[in-house]
Amino acid sequence: MKSIDQVNLGEKDRQAIDEAVQLLYQSFSIEQIILYGSKARGMDDTESDIDLLLLTSEELDWKGRNAITDALYDIQLTHGVVISTLVLPIHEWTQGRYTVLPIHDEIERYGVAA
């Protein structure tokens, strides 16, 4: 898997991702963060969002997911970006139902370790 330094990102996207990654690792039980979607593939345009897969050590309820969304709000406003998150326990990503979905293949192929 490529690292974030190997991806051609605009400055505001890079800053937003760096801040989001730091905040998420410090504030939540995140095991791994992966950039995916058009930005990871290098096919983004001015309307593209930042897609982040957040793999957690445990299942998060709706309150935990909302806390992540709320925590990212200021970063989105500051940098003028939209950050979309897919939050999953790491065991579901590696062994659960997601292993057979097309999004799993896409992220395994094009995902970028953030």
Label for each model-derived stretch:
Residues 51-55:
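Short beta-strand->loop micro-motif that forms the acidic, two-metal-ion catalytic signature
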